[in-house]
């Protein structure tokens, strides 16, 4: 999950390096290379974890039954909703990040570096979660993380909407808030995913697919309108 959180933030830096050396067309070639490497690695190095007696047939009826079981579980439904809202917040920031860095805060030349720095700083969230999850429990950590995000975003909203920040502090305040969003993601998403799969070990593949697909789709439906509301300020993202 740490890799999952960090990759979207580090990706602009990787893309910038590819474009610098081989041009924008090289990005599409990179997709092909990465897909081949990933699929080859899984095929050659990743064994099947389920024992033979627990494996299901790859048939339509079996898949449909597993999907119904997953989607009918109330805990899975609630966790998926929370993940959609959390992903929506992160996707909304990602969709407007370049405009905010370039147009609002005039950091276009350093955008990949700032974004990579944001990813590295927020990665401490996954380390912190790994340290305390057994002591505090997944649910408690998730609740604490979201309350922290409410407080940080609330303070940021007061400062921005009240025009209380001097010019010199506007970008540092935004950067701190953006790091807090990714930090929250690092703390919560792994726990939420584990909570969704907690009682679905026998259909873990289908459960992971359903939770991931539904939460991502919900996040896109949240983030897309927010991105369209961009007005040259950070206000629409804060409201979201």
Segment roles from a protein language model:
Residues 140-191:
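C-terminal transmembrane helical hairpin of 12-TM major facilitator-type secondary transporters
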Residues 72-92, 179-183, 192:
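Pair of pore-lining "gating" transmembrane helices in MFS-fold secondary transporters
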Residues 7-19, 23, 98, 129, ...:
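Small-residue (Gly/Pro/Ala) motifs that create kinks and tight helix-helix packing interfaces
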Residues 1-12, 38, 86, 118, ...:
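Structural signature of transmembrane alpha-helices in multi-pass secondary transporters
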Residues 2-46, 50:
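Helix-loop-helix hairpin linking two adjacent transmembrane segments in secondary transporters
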Residues 182, 192-235, 240:
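A late C-terminal transmembrane helix in Major Facilitator Superfamily
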């Amino acid at each position: 999950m740490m890799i999952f959180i960090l990759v979207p933030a580090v990706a602009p830096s990787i893309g910038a390096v590819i474009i610098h050396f081989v041009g924008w067309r090289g990005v599409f070639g990179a997709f092909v290379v990465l897909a081949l490497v990933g699929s080859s690695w899984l095929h050659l190095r990743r064994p099947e974890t389920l024992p033979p007696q627990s494996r299901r047939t790859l048939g339509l009826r079996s898949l449909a039954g597993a999907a119904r079981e997953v989607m009918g579980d109330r805990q899975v439904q609630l966790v998926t909703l929370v993940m959609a809202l959390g992903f929506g917040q992160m996707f909304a920031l990602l969709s407007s990040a370049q405009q905010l860095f370039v147009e609002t805060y005039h950091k276009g030349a350093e955008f990949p570096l700032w974004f990579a720095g944001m990813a590295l700083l927020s990665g401490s969230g996954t380390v912190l979660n790994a340290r305390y999850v057994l002591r505090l429990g997944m649910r408690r950590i998730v609740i604490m993380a979201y309350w922290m995000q409410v407080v940080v975003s609330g303070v940021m909203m007061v400062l921005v909407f009240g025009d209380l920040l001097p010019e010199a502090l506007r970008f540092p305040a935004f950067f701190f808030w953006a790091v807090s969003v990714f930090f929250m993601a690092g703390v919560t998403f792994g726990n939420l995913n584990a909570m969704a799969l907690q009682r679905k070990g026998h259909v873990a593949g289908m459960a992971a697919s359903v939770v991931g697909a539904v939460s991502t789709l919900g996040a896109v439906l949240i983030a897309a309108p927010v991105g369209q509301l961009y007005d040259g300020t950070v206000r629409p993202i804060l409201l979201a």
